[in-house]
Amino acid sequence: MSSSLSGKLSIEIEVKSSARAFYEANAKRLYEIPKLCPNCIPRIDLVEGKWEEVGAVVNWHLAYGGKTVISKEIYESIDDEKLSVTFKVIGGSFVESFKSFKFISQVFPKKEGSLVRWTYEYEKLNADIPDPKDLLQFAADLTREIDDTLMKISQE
C-alpha cells in the first residue's frame, strides 16, 4: 500500500454487554444484526456461503450519511479466542473511493461490560479522497445500538 493513500483508523467504545454476547452478535449471528440495530443496518443479505463461515459474502445495507449505502463484504477471518472478526470490502459504494477496505471488530472483556474496538484499514484510490473519519461515528452509533438492544434482551 502506498503510504500517502493508505490509512488506519480506530475507535473504542465501552458497552454494558458482556464481551462474549457482543462478539457473538457481531461475528456469529450476522442475520440478527438488522434486529439489533435497525437504525444503522436495516438489512443484510447473504450472497454466498453460510452465515457463520469464513468466506461468506454479505451485502450490508448501511444507513450512513443520510442515505442507504451498500457494502459487499467477505467474511475474511474470525478468532473466537481474541473475540475478533474481519470483513473485507469487495463491492458496493466503498469501492468507488477505496482500492481496499477492511472492517475489524474486536471485543475486550472488562470487569463490568466490555470494550469494543473498531479498526478500519484502507487504501484510497487517490489523494483527493478524505480519510473515512465519519465512519468512526457510525461505528460508535452502531455499537451503542447493538449494546442497548442486547441489554434489553438480557433483561426480558
For each of these PLM feature ranges, what is it?
Residues 11-13, 71-77, 101-109:
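Hydrophobic/aromatic beta-strand elements that line small-molecule binding cavities or substrate pockets
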Residues 1-53:
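Hydrophobic ligand-binding cavity/cleft-lining segments
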Residues 3-5, 50-52, 65-69, 95-99, ...:
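A generic structural micro-feature
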Residues 36, 43-95, 153:
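Glycine-rich portal/gate segments that line the openings of hydrophobic small-molecule binding cavities
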Residues 22, 26, 58, 75, ...:
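Structural signal for hydrophobic/aromatic residues that build the beta-strand cores
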